[in-house]
Amino acid sequence: MGYLKRLVLYIVIMVMSVFIIGCDKSSDTAENPKEGSKEAQIKKSFSKTLDMYPIKNLENLYDKEGYRDGEFKKGDKGTWTISTDFAKSNKQGEMNSEGMVLHFNRNTRTATGYYTVRTTYDEVDKLAREKKYRVEFKNNKIVLLDKVEDENLKQKIENFKFFGQYADFKDLKNYKNGRISSNENVPYYEAEYKRNNSDGNVKKLREKYPITTKQSPILKLHIDGDIKGSSVGYKQIEYTFSKEKDDETFMSDFLNFGPSHSK
């Protein structure tokens, strides 16, 4: 009888031990994603470009190689495209956004693009207003190619800084508790992280843009295309400070490498 009691007690202890160990492993996986998990793959994919941040001299992109596939023609060195856009709802039913895109052609070692000022409306029948100003990048400076009457706007364009010029993602691998979503049929992959207002990148964005909300932002890492690499898709990061109607506030940024003929 005593033997049976000891045997039952032993079995109970073993079952409890397995359960506790299993719980601990689940917690570790949530906190620190395993190598090969979707979250780890997304971080690895983004690290290929975000490790380049901050880019102190954008002309260094002429000497940077990127992911190459069959979409590149023979002899094409490729083109880097960098873009930053800030959008905010300043008036009921309206969204105002401003930003710049530059294409750094590694074949010609020239960089051209646009600064865009845009207003979109909630009303379906109301057309968006958009104005583009041609720019080029020379001697590590933005040069306006179009005449701009508004002196404040002119200064804003000439002194524009891309997020990639001052952002720092060296601790990306330590970001935890990401909300992961994906669809391999599309394919697309996303990881969202809640960031504190004390975060270095968040502080810099608040210094640079008229962000009025005190809410901590959500950082979204979005991949459109093959997670292992593709010149057809794109990778974009977005900081969403507010989703509230008539107070929406977000910044989007991307750095991508692709064939020159598609630019």
UniProtKB/Swiss-Prot annotation:
The lineage of its organism: Bacteria, Bacillati, Bacillota, Bacilli, Bacillales. One of its GO terms (cellular component) is plasma membrane. It comes from Staphylococcus aureus (strain N315). This is Uncharacterized lipoprotein SA0402. NCBIfam families: SA_tandem_lipo. PROSITE patterns: PROKAR_LIPOPROTEIN. It is found in: Cell membrane. A lipid is attached at C23 (S-diacylglycerol cysteine). Belongs to the staphylococcal tandem lipoprotein family. The keyword Hydrolase does not apply. The gene is lpl6. A lipid is attached at C23 (N-palmitoyl cysteine). Keywords: Cell membrane, Lipoprotein, Membrane, Palmitate, Signal. Residues 1-22 form the signal peptide. InterPro entries: Csa (IPR007595), Csa_sf (IPR038641).
